[in-house]
Design a protein with these regions (language model features):
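C-terminal long alpha-helix characteristic of the crotonase
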Residues: 128-133, 161, 175, 184-207
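Charged catalytic carboxylate motif
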Residues: 30-34, 90, 97, 196
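Hydrophobic, secondary-structure "cap" segments at the distal end of domains
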Residues: 152-161
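Hydrophobic/aromatic residues within transmembrane alpha-helices
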Residues: 15, 53, 65, 120-121, ...
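Acidic, divalent-metal-coordinating active-site segment for phosphoryl/phosphodiester hydrolysis
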Residues: 115, 171-177
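Glycine-rich beta-to-alpha active-site loop
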Residues: 58, 92-142, 146
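Conserved CoA-thioester-binding segment of acyl-CoA-metabolizing enzymes
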Residues: 1-56
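Glycine- (often His-adjacent) and acidic-residue-rich active-site loop
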Residues: 22, 55-97, 113, 143
Length: 207
């Protein structure tokens, strides 16, 4: 099954990261092209005027697929040259497709958004979070260099100092701190998040 599901409700596209048994981890073979295909379908449908991105199950996205990293498979397989290609053809395709989406994109962060998952959320124009959500860019804790574009984007969202603090410490922050820092716009109870995201999407689509 595709990593990204697409549902259309009138002028709104709902895109759902769909690997709930792995907290929507990303980086398996084919994830990049799958996300690109969904984004292309959204752009091709001129009746779609806004999109909402969320995660299936209890997480938005736990980030890169650590199991695939350990097994050296998917985007993380092979020799260093191959890993570079895996990032270019898989991970980078995911973030570029979302960042370059031609309609406004809202991230409805329904749970943990960690590492690549946090950076994927940041590709949206607007970020809303459930009150229990956690966000962090924890690459250094895994001995990784942030390589998905988030290190470029994060300082532009929350400022250089706070971005450096998150990147250098690997700290995970709660939704209230994320709102205080400007990483998310609004916080809602978990059972209200998607409803509020849809209300906002409908307002945007109506402009």
């Amino acid at each position: 099954m595709s990593i990204l599901l697409l549902e259309k409700r009138g002028p709104i596209a709902i895109m759902t990261l769909n690997r709930p048994d792995m907290m929507n981890a990303l980086g398996q073979a084919g994830d990049g092209p799958a996300v690109a295909a969904v984004c292309a379908e959204v752009v091709a449908d001129k009746s779609i005027r806004c999109a909402v991105l969320t995660g299936a199950g209890r997480a938005f996205s736990a980030g890169g697929d650590v199991k695939a990293m350990k097994e050296r498979s998917g985007a993380f397989g092979g020799k260093p040259y191959d890993v570079r290609g895996g990032y270019r053809d898989n991970i980078h395709v995911i973030v570029r497709s979302l960042y370059n989406l031609e309609v406004p994109l809202i991230s409805a962060i329904n749970g943990p958004a960690i590492g690549l998952g946090c950076d994927v959320a940041c590709m949206a124009d607007i970020r809303l979070a459930a009150d229990h959500a956690k966000l962090g860019v924890t690459f250094l804790k895994l001995g990784l260099i942030p390589g998905d574009g988030g290190a470029w984007l994060l300082p532009r969202l929350i400022g250089a100092s706070r971005a450096a603090q998150l990147l250098f410490t690997g700290d995970v922050i709660d939704a209230a701190t994320a709102k205080e820092w400007g990483l998310v716009s609004e916080i809602y109870p978990a059972d209200e998040l998607m409803g509020e995201a849809m209300k906002l999407a409908e307002r945007i689509a109506g402009q």
